[in-house]
């Protein structure tokens, strides 16, 4: 978040009046354009921070419904089969059918929630302009091209006027303008790549979550039919195994897809932004120090009168590094709190592993006992499988609920202290707009 400093302190004595006025006008245009480009990055960060303000509850609701449905199925299955291990014919199949219907309903709700997120993302990418990364990137690069042309025009103007070209102050000013340009581009680069990574990861996860819930619903439907046609049991358990495998892999695959897309975005942007490779904040501060040294040797009183304004605006640059770290840390933290249990790598591995175990136990026990009508031993295995289901779904419900509560507490705490990402960004935008107003007041 760049910026900026009032640099219109070129002495009229160094050049003819026309060249001086043209230089001041160019400085104003360059600085205001840099400010506007800086706000572009802030707006994209703000959109990322606010993006899931309400939609996160669709995630939470869908995942909780999905897990709750199978929790009901596991509890009823354990009750019916566990209490009738030695009397298999007393198992109430109608109760099991109703329980599996609950499981199907929950997974359908979960799949619908994730599908709705994909749909809303698609609609949002069409109608949203301000925070849409693709549109923002296109506009940023277009405006950056114009900024670079103005900087180049300024360099040519300075080079063609002997007085301007010999001024240490103006040379230092030019270095700082270049450094500010790189700082703004680097900020945009980091923001764009982060937002792209997060959005691609989310989209891939939603797609896989639709698949996870769909295969779970199919498995429940086939298992329901297998109560009356036992030879369908292997097919039902295979669907559960697929669902479990997707549950385990989804967070890893989605985060991997985001990182790959991020690398592509980084490579593409690095070429377009033409960054110097200097540590940007440190380079800006070094250029500012050099400019201040040049100011000390300046004899023109009109320039010295502008120095306090320079010092006030300098605070924006000097606070840039720490603020950028706080904002990015805040965005990452918000992303962490927004993750449901199925998006948490270790929680999803535990949950998916248990569903995978359910399918494996179900298939193995059917092949060994069920198809040979050794029902008592088969019931013991099925009871164990249902207990595993209860454990998995309870973990899913608990981990998702914990993430939701932690996120809401962090939001409430940040709102009270006015230290949320949104608050930091809003304050920064106001500061930049204030500096922009000061720049526009300067007359050559």
Model-derived features with residue positions:
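Classical Sec-dependent N-terminal signal peptides that target proteins to the secretory pathway
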Residues: 1-17
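Leu/Val/Ala/Ile-rich N-terminal alpha-helices, chiefly Sec-type signal peptides and the beginnings
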Residues: 16-111, 117, 124, 170-207, ...
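Cytosolic/matrix-facing juxtamembrane and C-terminal tails of multi-pass cellular membrane proteins
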Residues: 19-33, 37, 133-160, 264-340, ...
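Membrane-proximal, non-transmembrane alpha-helical segments
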Residues: 39-47, 170-200, 307-344, 348, ...
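Membrane-active amphipathic alpha-helices enriched in small hydrophobic residues
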Residues: 57-82, 98-126, 197-225, 235-264, ...
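A structural signal for well-ordered alpha-helices, especially hydrophobic packing surfaces
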Residues: 69-72, 113-116, 120, 148-162, ...
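Interhelical loop segments of eukaryotic multi-pass membrane proteins
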Residues: 86-91, 133-137, 228-234, 270-271, ...
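Surface-exposed, polar helix/loop patches in the mature regions of secreted/periplasmic/lumenal proteins
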Residues: 123-135
């Amino acid at each position: 978040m760049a910026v900026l400093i009032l640099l219109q302190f070129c002495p009229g004595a160094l050049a003819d009046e026309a060249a001086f006025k043209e230089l001041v006008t160019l400085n104003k245009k360059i600085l205001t354009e840099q400010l506007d480009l800086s706000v572009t990055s802030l707006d994209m960060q703000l959109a990322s921070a606010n993006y899931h303000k309400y939609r996160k509850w669709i995630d939470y609701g869908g995942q909780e419904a999905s897990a709750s449905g199978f929790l009901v199925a596991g509890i009823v299955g354990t009750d019916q089969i566990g209490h009738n291990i030695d009397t298999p014919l007393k198992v109430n199949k109608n109760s099991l059918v109703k329980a599996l219907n609950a499981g199907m309903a929950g997974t359908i709700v979960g799949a619908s929630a994730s599908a709705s997120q994909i749909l809303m993302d698609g609609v949002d990418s069409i109608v949203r302009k301000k925070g849409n990364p693709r549109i923002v990137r296109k506009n940023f690069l277009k405006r950056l091209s114009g900024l670079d042309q103005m900087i180049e025009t300024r360099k040519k103007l300075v080079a063609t006027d002997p007085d301007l070209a010999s001024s240490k102050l103006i040379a230092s000013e030019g270095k700082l303008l270049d450094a500010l340009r790189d700082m703004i581009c680097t900020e945009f680069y980091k923001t764009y790549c982060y937002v792209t990574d997060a959005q691609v990861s989310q989209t891939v996860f939603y797609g896989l979550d639709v698949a996870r819930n769909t295969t779970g619903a199919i498995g429940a439907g086939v298992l329901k039919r297998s109560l009356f046609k036992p030879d369908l049991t292997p097919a039902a358990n295979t669907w559960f195994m697929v669902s479990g495998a997707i549950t385990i892999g989804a967070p890893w695959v989605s985060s991997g897809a985001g990182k790959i897309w991020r690398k592509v975005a980084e490579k593409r942007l690095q070429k377009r932004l033409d960054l110097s490779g200097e540590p940007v904040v440190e380079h800006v501060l070094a250029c500012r120090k050099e400019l201040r040294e040049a100011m000390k040797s300046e004899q023109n009183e009109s320039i010295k009168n502008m120095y306090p304004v320079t010092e006030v605006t300098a605070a924006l640059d000097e606070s840039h590094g720490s603020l950028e770290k706080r904002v990015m840390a805040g965005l990452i933290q918000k992303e962490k709190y927004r993750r449901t249990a199925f998006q948490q790598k270790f929680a999803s591995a535990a949950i998916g592993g248990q569903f995978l175990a359910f399918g494996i136990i179900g298939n193995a026990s059917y092949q060994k006992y069920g198809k040979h009508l050794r029902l008592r031993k088969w019931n013991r295995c099925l009871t164990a499988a249902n207990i595993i289901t209860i454990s998995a779904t309870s973990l899913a419900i608990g981990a998702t609920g914990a993430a939701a509560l932690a996120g809401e507490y962090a939001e409430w705490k940040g709102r009270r202290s006015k230290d949320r990402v949104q608050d930091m960004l809003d304050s920064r935008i106001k500061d930049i707009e204030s500096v922009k107003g000061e720049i526009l007041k300067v007359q050559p």
